[in-house]
Structures are given as structure tokens and as C-alpha cells.
């Protein structure tokens, strides 16, 4: 995204975020102010900004000459960011079926579902820069009927994508004055899922607004004590709790090694056992929720005006005492065999870039864990990806979900589910309490997996509905 210039910021002063995404904590003035409320400024600025400059060149990112905070944090993983940036530019800046101002308005609608003031403010500025009608920023009721018709599918994609049916697609494509073409709808659906998942990344990494153009520091939430806010280094292992952290890492690595050996020896569970373990994991995910003392985010009226049915949110795919929708068997509609080919037919420019971005996140590895190097992390990355798909009701027949419980600690599960399903409830405490002994860049890596797995899950449901509509 592009940071608004000073003129646009002044014009949108009432809309732009001013105190960061962690709305439920007190603020104190600190300096220098970094791009994240969760990550020490010296770590993210040094590694993130340097990585971006080396791999892409700062001028390739921003015509304004400024790099936003999201890009700097994501720049901790420059190989992934390259793929992300290509798709982001295609969706929002390259010629396509939808006018540029419409794309930014759709992005506003998507980000508002999660009350993500960082993204809403950024896209408001870009909406005006691309010639958008300022009246539309007063709320959905001032936008064209054609855009308002996206509200229902925006709501479902953001919170319960498994409810999307071919009837939702038919209603949008039905011939009429305010109908969508299939090419327009595909671009809109990809953009909606892109922004929903990007909101997860913003909240999951504690991304802060850029501040005023003069660069004066804005209020920032106080950092917790250093032993909580920064994962221990090798030296800190000599301090209280350090040996316990080291043992946790060693235990995780041993479980990973055992799983990899069993896979090589073909000691996998039977199909019935794997299905049973998926159902167990899905049921147990009901218990993986944020603490009851987490307050509901304050509903910002400047964002609620872009939202219809604001009380609609994520509900567990399997709920006690209710008739659950059928499990989405990944083998019946895969990204590789079905989703990708459909996107390639209807939105060829986006299909290849989407696939590259998914692969960049899924395969990204530095073969390190905390203070250890030369580690094969494939089973851990797969467990995180498949757990995210599990909470969205997607099952892989060839995956043993017993691995999820062996590799993902409860604090990590709580964090993953919160960031993926209701990111606006994410807190610094959640971020600090999983993988305390890991580097911040490794936690950002988890957020990249979250972003892409969530986006792919929602897209699979939407593309399956389109396929059913077309057949």
C-alpha cells in the first residue's frame, strides 16, 4: 500500500488511525517510534528496511519515496515480500476490470469488517488520490448500488466463508442494471480476501500507523518487561527461565525429528484414524479461544459506516448442538487442480501471482529454530498451515492431524485462531506468550503463513461456488 501524502492526511484527519491497532492498552509517548507495537524498533527497522532496500530498492515500493510500516515488518522476509508486492500492485494499481478508485473502496469495505483502521485509513487516502467521490466515504449508503451488493459476500468471506453458495454468485452476476461481470467479480473476490488476510497480518504483528509527515513520534503502547517482549538470545539462557526455554526448543525439535522419521518409514495412521483425528482436532478447536477477559474492540463509527450487519462474525465451524456444514475435503476441490485453473481462465494475470505467493509463504524456510540452525522445519510449517485450514473446516485426507497437537503449543493455537478468525481481538500478551524463545522474525513468519492460509481457504470456498454456478 502507499502512504497518504500530507494533503490527503489532513483531508482525512477524522478517519485516519492515530493510536495504533492495540486499542485496549494505555499509551505513553516513547521514542524513537517503530513500525510495530510488538517488535523492538531496532530489530525490525534494521533487518526489515535493509532487506527491502537490498532486494527491491526502495524506489520500487513507493512513488512517494516512503516505505510504510507494513512493508518494513514484512520486509523481514524479503523473498516472500517480492511475491506479495507483485500481487498487491496487480490488484490495486495495474489495469484491470475494475476502476482503481473502486478497488480501494472494496479494500475499505474488506478492512472495515475487522475494524482495521490502519488499512481503512490508507485506502481512504488512495481512494481520493485515484479520483474517488468523497461522498462515498460517508458510508455504504452513499456508494453505488453495485458496490453495496458486495456486502453480503464480503461479510461471508471475512467471517464464515463455508456459507458461500452458488446462489450468492448468481445474485451478483444476474443480468440487470447493477450486475457484475464475471471478470469484475473475480478481481473483487481476490481483493476482498487479500484485504481480510492483510488485516490479520496488521493485527497479528501489531502494525502501527506511520505518524504525521514531519516524523514526530506518536503515542505507543508501553513495552512489557524485556524478558517478555524480546525472545531470549543465547546469552539470556543463563538467566531465570532460560534453561526452561531451551528445553522447550529441544523438545519441539525432538518431536519434529520423530515425526519426520515416522514419515520416512511409512508408519502413518490408517485413513480412518486420520479422519478421526481431524474431527477431534476440529472439536478441540472449540476450546481454543481468547481469554474471556479480552474486551470486544471498540466499534469505530467511522468504520461501521462501511459495514452491514456488524454483529456478524466468526463462529466455530463445528458448534455443539448445531448442524455443522459438511467438511470441505481438500482433495475434492484443491487449489492446485481446481482453484488455480479457474483463476487462470478468468483472471490470468492474477492466477500465476497468487500461486507464487502461496508457494512463497508455504515453502519459506531458513532451516533455523530459535538458536538452532540446520533444522528441517517442513513438518512444523505444514502443521501451522493445516491447522489454519482446519479452523475454516478444510480437511486433508492424507494428513495426520495428530501432528498438530504434537507440534503446536496451546498458546500458539490461541494466537493462530485469534489472528485468523477475529484478528481485531489480538493483543500484545497473545503475541508474547507463544514461542517466547523464538526470534521476532520467526513470529512474523508465522503471520505470513496465517495470511496466506487464511486467504487460500476463503478463496477455495468462493471459487468452488463459482465452479458450481458455471456447471
Swiss-Prot record:
PTM annotation (N-acetylmethionine): residues: 1
Annotated stretches, region: N-terminal domain: 57-230
Enzyme Commission identifier(s): 1.11.1.-
Region listing for Disordered, in residue ranges: 212-241
Cysteine disulfide partners in this protein: none
Residues that coordinate or bind L-leucine: 365-368, 377, 442
Gene3D superfamilies documented for this protein: AhpD-like
Enzyme's top EC category: oxidoreductase
Protein name, entry field: Sestrin-2
UniProt organism field: Bos taurus
Taxonomic classification: Eukaryota, Metazoa, Chordata, Craniata, Vertebrata
Amino acid at each position: 500500500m502507499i502512504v497518504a501524502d500530507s494533503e490527503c492526511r489532513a483531508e482525512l484527519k477524522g478517519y485516519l488511525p492515530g493510536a495504533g491497532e492495540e486499542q485496549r492498552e494505555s499509551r505513553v509517548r516513547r521514542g524513537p517510534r517503530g513500525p510495530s507495537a510488538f517488535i523492538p524498533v531496532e530489530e525490525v527497522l534494521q533487518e526489515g528496511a535493509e532487506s527491502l532496500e537490498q532486494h527491491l530498492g526502495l524506489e520500487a515500493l513507493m512513488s512517494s519515496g516512503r516505505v510504510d510500516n507494513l512493508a518494513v515488518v514484512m520486509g523481514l522476509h524479503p523473498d516472500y515480500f517480492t511475491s506479495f508486492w507483485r500481487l498487491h500492485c496487480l490488484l490495486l494499481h495495474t489495469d484491470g476490470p475494475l476502476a482503481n478508485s473502486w478497488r480501494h473502496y472494496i479494500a475499505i469495505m474488506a478492512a472495515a469488517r475487522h475494524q482495521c483502521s490502519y488499512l481503512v485509513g490508507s485506502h481512504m487516502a488512495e481512494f481520493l488520490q485515484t479520483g474517488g467521490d468523497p461522498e462515498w466515504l460517508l458510508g455504504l449508503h452513499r456508494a453505488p448500488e453495485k458496490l453495496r451488493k458486495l456486502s453480503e459476500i464480503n461479510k461471508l468471506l471475512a467471517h464464515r466463508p463455508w456459507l458461500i453458495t452458488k446462489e450468492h454468485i448468481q445474485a451478483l452476476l444476474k443480468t440487470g442494471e447493477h450486475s457484475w461481470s464475471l471478470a469484475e467479480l473475480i478481481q473483487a473476490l481476490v481483493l476482498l480476501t487479500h484485504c481480510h488476510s492483510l488485516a490479520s497480518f496488521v493485527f497479528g504483528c501489531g502494525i502501527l500507523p506511520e505518524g504525521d509527515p514531519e516524523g514526530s513520534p506518536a503515542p505507543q503502547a508501553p513495552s512489557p518487561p524485556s524478558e517478555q517482549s524480546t525472545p531470549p538470545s543465547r546469552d539470556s539462557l543463563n538467566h531465570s527461565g532460560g534453561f526452561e526455554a531451551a528445553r522447550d526448543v529441544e523438545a519441539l525439535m525432538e518431536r519434529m525429528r520423530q515425526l519426520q522419521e515416522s514419515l520416512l518409514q511409512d508408519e502413518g495412521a490408517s485413513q480412518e484414524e486420520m479422519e478421526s483425528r481431524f474431527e477431534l482436532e476440529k472439536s478441540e478447536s472449540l476450546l481454543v479461544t481468547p481469554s474471556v477477559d479480552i474486551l470486544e474492540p471498540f466499534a469505530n463509527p467511522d468504520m461501521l459506516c462501511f459495514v452491514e450487519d456488524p454483529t456478524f462474525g466468526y463462529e466455530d465451524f463445528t458448534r455443539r448442538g448445531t448442524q455443522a456444514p459438511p467438511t470441505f475435503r481438500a482433495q475434492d476441490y484443491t487449489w492446485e487442480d481446481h482453484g488455480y485453473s479457474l483463476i487462470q481462465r478468468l483472471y490470468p494475470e492474477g492466477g500465476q501471482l497468487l500461486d507464487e505467493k502461496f508457494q512463497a509463504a508455504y515453502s519459506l524456510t531458513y532451516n533455523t529454530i530459535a538458536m538452532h540452525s540446520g533444522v528441517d522445519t517442513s513438518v512444523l510449517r505444514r502443521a501451522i498451515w493445516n491447522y489454519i485450514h482446519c479452523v475454516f473446516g478444510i480437511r486433508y485426507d492424507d494428513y495426520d492431524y495428530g501432528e498438530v497437537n504434537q507440534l503446536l503449543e496451546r498458546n500458539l493455537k490461541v494466537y493462530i485462531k485469534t489472528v485468523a478468525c477475529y484478528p481485531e481481538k489480538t493483543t500484545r500478551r497473545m503475541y508474547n506468550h507463544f514461542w517466547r524463545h523464538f526470534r521476532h522474525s520467526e513470529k512474523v513468519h508465522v503471520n505470513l503463513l496465517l495470511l496466506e492460509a487464511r486467504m487460500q481457504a476463503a478463496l477455495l470456498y468462493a471459487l468452488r461456488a463459482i465452479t458450481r454456478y458455471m456447471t
